[in-house]
C-alpha cells in the first residue's frame, strides 16, 4: 500500500455537537487516556499498541498528539505527521511511544487522536458521521522473566465529546487499595488551561472516606496512587472543581493485583446524577455542544515511521 505523509498546521478537532453518542459508537475525535513506554514495578515494562480503523470507502486523514504527563503542553506537544488512513484499513501502530514512534522511552501520558478538520473538511454538524473512525489501544507489560507472554489492559479511545465538563461527574467503581490490590487514578485534559479536579473516594457503603484536589496542566495528564488505603470495592468520583467553562477532562483508574502485577482498566461512567451544586455552572447547558477544541501547537516527532511501527518486534 502506498502511503504518504501530509504536512500542515492543524487548528482544531471537530467534536460532534448535539446529543452525545454511546461510549462505544464511533466518532471523529478521541482521547486515549493512558499511553506508556517505561519500566514499572516488579520488573515489568509497559508499552502501548494503538490501532486505528477506517470504516469509510475513502481515505481519512488522522492526527496523533502525545501529551506527556506532568507537563504543561499549551506551548506545544509532539505530533505525528498526518496519517492517511486508507479505506477500510486497520492500521496497527505497535509500541507507539517506542523508538519508531514518538520515541518517548521512560515516558507516559495521554494521546489525542482525531480526524483532521482541514484535510477531511469535517462538517462537525449533529449526526454527521463522515469523519468517524475507530480508535483502540492496549497497554501491556512484557514478561519480566523474558518469556514470550504478556498481560494487556484495554484502553479504547474515549469519545472526546463524552468527557467530564461542568455538567457531569465521573464514577469509577470496584476500586480497591488493600492487601490484595492497589489503585492508580488518572486524568487526561483536552483543555488549554489549568484545571483542578476533585476526587471523592467512597467506601462500599457510600461514605466519602477521602476528598482530594488535583491540578491538571493545560492539555495535560496526571496519574497518582489512590490516597486512601484499606479500601475494598469502593468507588472514586471525579468532577471539575476549578476550571474554565469550556474545560473537558477524561478520568480513568487501574486496579493492580499486588501478587501478580496484573492490571485492570476501570473506565469512567459519566452522568449528571450526584453532581455537587458548586461544580455546576450557569454556562453548563452550552459546554457539551462545543464543536471545536483547540489542539496544542505541533512539535516534531522526527523518528515517527508508519512503516517501522507496522512491524511487531517482540
Place the predicted regions along the sequence by residue.
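Bacterial N-terminal signal peptides that target proteins for export
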Residues: 1-9
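Bacterial N-terminal signal peptides
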Residues: 8-17
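Gly/Pro-rich, tryptophan- and cysteine-flecked surface segments typical
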Residues: 21-314
